[in-house]
Every structure is written in structure tokens, then in C-alpha cells.
Amino acid sequence: MTISTYRNEAESCVSLFNLLTQNGDTLFKPLTVSSFERLFLDPAICPAVFVGYEGDRLIAFGAGNCTGETGYITYIGVLPGYRRSGCGRMIAETLEAALADTHPEMKKIELVFYNPTELPWFIPGHAPHDHAGEPGVDMSTPAYPFFSSLGYRAWTVQNTYYLPLADYRCPDEMAGRLARLKENGIEITRYDRNIHHGFSELFDNIGNEGWRKRVMSRLDEDIVVAVRNGQVIGYTGPLSVSKEGRGLFCGIAVRTEYRHHGIGKALFAGLCAGLSEKGASFMSLFTGDNNPARYVYESAGFTIVRSFATMRKIIR
């Protein structure tokens, strides 16, 4: 195999990419030439793309990018008939060397959700429902041992959760949870600026300025809140549905002094119900295997559809 820098081979790269998607080797959504160029060649991400040829036939390509001290490998694909012959390794090592040479400040290469290139992929068994980007390396595929053999090491496992929302009903146990909260003066409802107070103070309490900026500018939208004596002590939302039918999850928080009482689980179930009412057909998200937030998602009925390893290789 001969490797060279990408030179306007978009159509051949797209054909390879889509073949591996259609035959089930990957979960990625098919690309067009336009989407390929937008995702892989955007100059803002300092792209590196290499192609591999056997004679005049393109049999492999790989893509990555770099931001500051971190490089990312986005994709490596090899035609089935040429696998296990070192082609993938050659592409990967060429990418690594190119990123290191052109970015002397780069210290590591990662396969992780921070990659600025997000390749959308289908939820297995639930297409056309999709997710915006893979949070790492799919542990159920040959990609995981492949990158392990190249010296990449896993440091976390990210589970992707999925829940259909078209006919969503809160789990039976949630009625009891809501009743217990109400006995303690806590209600799950929609935010009303005319009767509720303390929303900004919630973000003071949890110390998250990013969420404050995103939420406080959208108080006229539907936001699920937990309130006690009119004070906002927790929230999730705003309720928003994408054109594809995805229920969007923008964050969830509970004041520190009210945690460990099941308020987060009640808020999240209220979010799912509200998104369903607004026409959402599904929701997907990912979180770390050891993140306690997983129990909030599982309590609402979410199930794990794929597990991904975040992987890293120290370069210098």
C-alpha cells in the first residue's frame, strides 16, 4: 500500500466510508461529498487526512486534527479485503507522525468526545435515531484491540444511553417518589417567573457559570424545576426538540443542601415526560461508567446501547 496526503479524493473516501457503514462494520451515518468535506477538511480544526492506494485503487483513509496540546484521530477505514495486512497501522502511524511534526506543542493523541469533529452515528437497532458523535472507541468492535495494539490506553468507559419517548410514561415508582417529595414541601413543576424565585442563586450554589448563561437567557421557555416555598432548588431543561425528533438534554442540577433525596431522578423523569409531550421521539446521552448520574438516567428507563473507551497515547 502506498500512502499519500489527501488530494481531492472525496468521492472515493466517501464510497469507502459508506461501504463500511452499510455492511455493518461501523454505526456511522452515511456521508455525502459535502458532509465529508465539512467534517474532515475544515481548516479551523487543523485537519490531517491521508489516503492509501493499492495500485490506482483507494483502499484506506484516515483523518485527524489537533487543538493545542491534544491531537485527535477521528477515523481510520480500510476495505475489508485489505485488513490484517498492516494497512490500518500504516495509516495510523502516518497520522500520528504528521500531527506531531506539524504541531510541536502537541503532547498526546486522544480518541474521546472532545474531538471537534463529531461523526453522527445511528443508535443500533433504532435507526434513523442517531447521536451526534462517538464518545470514544466502540468496545464491541475490532477498533478497540486495534488502538490498544498501537499503544493507546483506555482511561474511562463512556456508556451511551437511549430511550424512546414517543409513548413515554414515568416509571411506576416515580409516583411514590413525587408523593414523598410533596410531603416535604417539594414540588416538580414548570418554572413561572411570576411565582418562583432563586433561579440565579441556584447557580451560585452549584458554581456553574456555563449553565447560568445557557439557562437564564431562556427563562421564557419551558423549564422543569423543583421548588420549595416558591424557591427554585433544582432544574432541568429547557424543554427542546430537534428537527430530527431528538429530545435535547441541556443539564440538570439540585442545590447542594437538597441532594440525596431523589429530586434529580424526579426532575429527569419530568424532563422525559415534557419532551414526549412536545413531540420528541427519542433521547440519547452518554456518561461515565462510574458517574452516579447513570442512576438518574436508569431510573427514568434509559438503557445502555453501546460502551466506548476513551483512549490516549502520550507522544512527547
What are these regions (language model features)?
Residues E93-K182, A309-K313:
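Acyl-donor-binding surface of acyltransferase catalytic domains
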Residues G24-V49, E54, A60-G71, Y75-I76, ...:
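A conserved beta-strand-loop-helix scaffold within acyl/acetyltransferase catalytic domains
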Residues I73, K108-L111, F249, M283-T287:
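Conserved hydrophobic beta-strand within the GNAT/NAT acetyltransferase core sheet
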Residues M1-E37, V51, Q158, E173-G210:
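Short amphipathic alpha-helix that is part of the acyltransferase structural core
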Residues F147, Y297-E298, F302:
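Conserved active-site tyrosine of GNAT-family acetyltransferases
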Residues F268, N290-A293, I314-I315:
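Short glycine/proline-centered loop/turn elements that form peptide/ligand docking sites
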Residues A60, T156-N159, G234, R306:
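A structural microfeature
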Residues V78, R84-L99, V254, H260-E277, ...:
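Conserved acetyl-CoA-binding loop-helix of GNAT-fold acetyltransferases
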